[in-house]
């Protein structure tokens, strides 16, 4: 569960950026950050791309990842020429955090911070 925010970090529920329900990314042109991923005590699924048959590529992340960047370029380079691509990038801070200071964590010498995220395949039921 996440909530897309505009450049002022305001929720944009009900707009074209509200992807909480199943939404086709065909023809989409996104380069946006989503927030409010913090209400988790453990690693959890934070985003997924699901095929019509229910199979999905799932992104999971530890609670340290409070943000998710969605990028859908139409001109991603490939062997057969440019094509559409989708990137789901878990992030610990939102875009422009070095200027805004939002969610920045200072790591002092000798401190250790560990966080994990990953991608897995979820088969369609019945496969």
Where do the PLM segments sit?
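Beta-strand secondary-structure signal
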Residues: 46-48, 87, 114-118
């Amino acid at each position: 569960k996440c909530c897309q925010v505009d450049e002022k970090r305001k929720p944009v529920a009900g707009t074209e950026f509200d992807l909480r329900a199943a939404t086709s990314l065909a023809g989409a042109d996104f380069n946006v950050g989503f927030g409010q991923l913090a209400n988790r005590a453990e690693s959890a699924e934070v985003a997924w791309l699901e095929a019509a048959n229910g199979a999905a590529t799932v992104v999971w992340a530890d609670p340290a990842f409070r943000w998710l960047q969605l990028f859908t370029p139409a001109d991603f380079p490939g062997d057969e020429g440019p094509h559409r691509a989708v990137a789901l990038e878990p992030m610990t801070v939102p875009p422009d955090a070095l200027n805004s200071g939002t969610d920045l964590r200072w790591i002092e010498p000798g401190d250790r911070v560990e966080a994990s995220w990953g991608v897995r395949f979820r088969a369609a039921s019945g496969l």
